Amino acid sequence: MFLRRLSIQWKITLLAGLCLLGVVALLVGLSVYRMQHSSVLVKSASTQMLDESARLRLEARGELQALRIQRYFMDAFQYGKGFSRQILFLRDQAQKRFLDAYDLREDLTRQVRTALAANPEVLGLYVVFEPNALDGKDELFVDQPALGSNDKGRFSLYWAQATPGQLESESMIESELADTSSGPSGAAYNAWYTCPKESGQPCVLDPYFDKVGERQLLMTSIAFPLELDGKVIGVMGLDINLSNLQALSEQGNRELYDGVGQVGILSPAGLFAGNSRDAGLLGKNLAKADPQHAGELLQLLAAGKSRLFNENDDLKVLQPLQPIPGAKPWGVLLEVPKSALLGPALALERQLDDMRREGTWVELGLGLGAAVLGLLVLWLSARGVTRPILGVAHMLRDIASGEGDLTQRLPHTGRDELGELAGWFNRFLDKLQPIIRDVKVSVRDARSTADQSAAISSQTSAGMQQQFREIDQVATASHEMTATAQDVARSAAQAADAARGADQATRDGLALIDRTTQSIDSLAANLTSAMGQVEQLASSSEEIGSVLEVIRAIAEQTNLLALNAAIEAARAGDAGRGFAVVADEVRNLARRTQDSVEQIRGVIEGLQQGTRDVVDAMHGSHRQAQGSVEQVDEAVAALQRIGEAVTVINDMNLQIASAAEEQSSVAEEINRNVAAIRDVTESLSSQAEESAQVSQSLNRLANHQQGLMEQFKA
């Protein structure tokens, strides 16, 4: 519908423009799609590459942190290994030189102290020999801690260094050496001694807190077996402070993406020796910090395998390390948010998105410019094509606006489609001009005949309408009279029915009142009987009260007799003790009987009061029942009078209904006759109106046709 209103020029421009816009949109869309697809591929490849690089970097950081920790342990290991060889050398030299046992123990004590003082980073050094394994003379040095001997004379020296330069020594008693109670890691308390002794290899203990001086420090022990001819004769160990490991974890976290992650150091049992995020977890199990992955991490740690985990928004790396040769693996646990780890990849993605959006807008602008330029060229081309058609249209408009002048002709000089159109249009006018001339003469004759027919039809229609209005008034009056007669008959019949219903209701009311009277009489008789029974119950309650009074008196007398018996039994001494017990029981029974009598008395008094209330209520009900009987008798008399009046009304309604029915039948007959006459008159009036309308329409058409013909100039 919209295209029909457009000119040919605009139709050509619109359709060709839509095709051009479709092609431009397709090309731009395809280009944008390819660019976006390429951007996605580039982002995916670059993100994957940067992600892999970040993972490798994180693993490298884990290895670097593991090497730092391993170097820290290896420094202590090398120191302890050298000192253990020195102790064995001192023992060997003492035997070769036949050095006195006292001097040997004194020399060992001095050497341990000197070694500890020379290494302030070590918290303590200890040397423990098997019984009589040092010099075979333990029994000579019982309870001599100054020479490193314990309560059995066994050499078990421990030097502690709470602060650098402040050294204290003690000898470890046998109960400490034999203490196998479990520590936080699950290992025995004396694992520092039993582990190297039983394995024959150096051991690193799990982290534990111990009091050094006045401070609670997290520490671990590296213990070395003292072997002679393949047999372990003692243990030498050193305690190292693990606060340095906490410092290493914090330093590693600062170096790892500006401290946004976490570095943890784990022992073989899963205890934290360092935690950069929460120092409160030191010495505690991994299960408290990460219960979900603790089991898997500890299994990997025990197997010495590294692993990289993806967990929600974080990336975790477990890097195992061997603190000393032959020891169980420890581990470094690195945790970094993916947002920090993949920061370069995300920045590259944002840069690619910006470039893609910029390219999209450039392509859209170029496409839109090309489309506008193409539409302009199409519009100019369509204008050149439609200009001759507009010339022919202007000529036809001049002919149409020149009062239907059929004498004009279109000039045509060309031999194209437009010239052929003008030639055939001129030939059409040559045939139409004489026909229009003859039609104009015929129209003038038809108009005069139509004027005469319209005048006659108007007069006939007016007369029929006057007759129809008068008959319609008669029919309306007859119909109203019939309706009134029918209403009177219906009202009389309804009144008769209502009177019969009232009469029946009166009879039903009398029967109901009669039954009610009988029920009230029966109720009054029952109340009279019940009153006698309740009064008898009240008298029985009073008799029960007198019986209870007798029981109470007997109970009091029994109580007095039991009291006298108890007094006599007391006078009789041991001979009357049994009788005193019986008298006491009798007195208790008498007191309980007396209490029960008082309770029963209270119940009986309540029952008597209730009985008196019931008697009063029943007297009132009896009086109300007698009053109700008198009111019912009065209602019966009133209903009988109503019934007599309803009977008279019913007879009169029947006579009125009969007369109204006869009047209604006569009125209906008259109404039918008048309605038939009205219908015939209405039909004639309608036909007369239709005839007048046809004549008027014919007259209007003749006038219109003459007006149309007058527009043509033939």
Swiss-Prot record:
It holds the Pfam family MCP-like_PDC_1. InterPro entries: HAMP_dom, MCPsignal_dom. The chain crosses the membrane at residues 12-32, 360-380. Histamine binds at residues 170, 208-210, 239. Residues 442-678 form the Methyl-accepting transducer domain. Belongs to the methyl-accepting chemotaxis (MCP) protein family. Homotetramer. Residues 50-290 form the Cache domain. Residues 383-437 form the HAMP domain. The keyword Cell membrane applies. It is a multi-pass membrane protein. Keywords: Cell membrane, Chemotaxis, Membrane, Methylation, Transducer, Transmembrane, Transmembrane helix. It comes from the Bacteria. Chemotactic-signal transducers respond to changes in the concentration of attractants and repellents in the environment, transduce a signal from the outside to the inside of the cell, and facilitate sensory adaptation through the variation of the level of methylation. TlpQ is a chemoreceptor that binds and mediates chemotaxis to histamine, a key biological signaling molecule. It binds histamine with high affinity, which permits responses to very low histamine concentrations. It is found in: Cell membrane. Disruption phenotype: The pctABC-tlpQ deletion mutant is devoid of histamine chemotaxis over the entire concentration range (50 nM to 50 mM). Deletion of the gene significantly reduces chemotaxis to AI-2. GO terms for biological process: chemotaxis; signal transduction. The keyword Transmembrane applies. GO terms for cellular component: plasma membrane. PROSITE patterns: CHEMOTAXIS_TRANSDUC_2 (PS50111), HAMP (PS50885). Gene3D superfamilies: HAMP domain in histidine kinase, Methyl-accepting chemotaxis protein, PAS domain. This is Methyl-accepting chemotaxis protein TlpQ.
